[in-house]
Amino acid sequence: MLEKFERYPLTFGATAIEYLPRLTEALGGDVEIWAKREDCNSGLAMGGNKLRKLEYIVPDAIASNADTLVSIGGVQSNHTRMVAAVAAKLGMKCRLVQESWVPHEDAVYDRVGNILMTRLMGADSRIVDDGFDIGIRQSWEDAIQSVIDEGGKPYAIPAGASVHKYGGLGYVAFAEEVARQEADLGFKFDYIIVCVVTGSTQAGMIVGFAAQDRADRVIGIDASGTPEQTRSQVRQIVDNTAELVELGRPVREDEIVILNDYAYPAYGVPSNETNEAIRLAARTEAMITDPVYEGKSMQGMIDLTRKGFFPKGSKVLYAHLGGAPALNGYSYTYRNG
């Protein structure tokens, strides 16, 4: 479905799928847990899922003759780290709005992890004291205008690269890649677990797996804490992406599966259960997840497995999207592991 779209390679290639035997055993052994390691996909600033999206956006940025990538995220945004990395790789400037999305007061929160790496790569990173919202923000529009006012030519990339016209394509490619890997493995996964906030990762998966008639097996774990807004944005991106790739049919509402039980107490704030999930993944598989995104999807997968959501014998694929650098912003929380 993606043949007509130009792709600028930023990743190593197909990401590894690995079986997680010790986590499987810790969860009772009746459901096989596997992981697709999007967190290990590139040498660019520790990689992550945003690079898969940006591969389909960069050709448009280059064609526009822009000299500055402009994007937005929270203080510990993985996305803005990846935009900064791409700008450095392409020899472009980068201006970033880092909003105060998370009610978290660790003393080093705005000086370590993602934002430290972002600044190290030369991005002009500006902290704005606005709260969490996945929609289009005035602060981002102001940043775009500021580049124009200074004589630059901006290329605008929204939060998470999600509502960009090509934002869903990378994870259509993910679904096609999984199908090829399943052919090599000799089986198909029964469920795919993915974190969802700004929406295009799950939306792209839904469209890609809809072409394989199994979109409803993509289980989104909401980490936004604003489930109605997130679902609406996923729906928007699904429809746009399905039209772009000429899926040939509308995606049904029941094919968009998002569970809202794990985002508490707030976006970017881990619950005790999130922390327990982070520790279990680390101590059984040395797989590092973060308290904002992957810790919550890990929590969701663990809880669903324990309460019998997945039938006995199921093979579950956990999409590890990255995000470990944010752990540095929670140094007090994890000071003892």
From Swiss-Prot:
Catalyzes a cyclopropane ring-opening reaction, the irreversible conversion of 1-aminocyclopropane-1-carboxylate (ACC) to ammonia and alpha-ketobutyrate. Allows growth on ACC as a nitrogen source. It comes from Rhizobium radiobacter. The modification N6-(pyridoxal phosphate)lysine is found at residue 50. Belongs to the ACC deaminase/D-cysteine desulfhydrase family. Keywords: Hydrolase, Pyridoxal phosphate. The keyword DNA repair does not apply. The active site is at 77 (nucleophile). This is 1-aminocyclopropane-1-carboxylate deaminase. It holds the Pfam family PALP. InterPro entries: ACCD_DCysDesulf, ACP_carboxylate_deaminase, ACP_carboxylate_deaminase_bac, TrpB-like_PALP, TrpB-like_PALP_sf. The lineage of its organism: Bacteria, Pseudomonadati, Pseudomonadota, Alphaproteobacteria, Hyphomicrobiales.
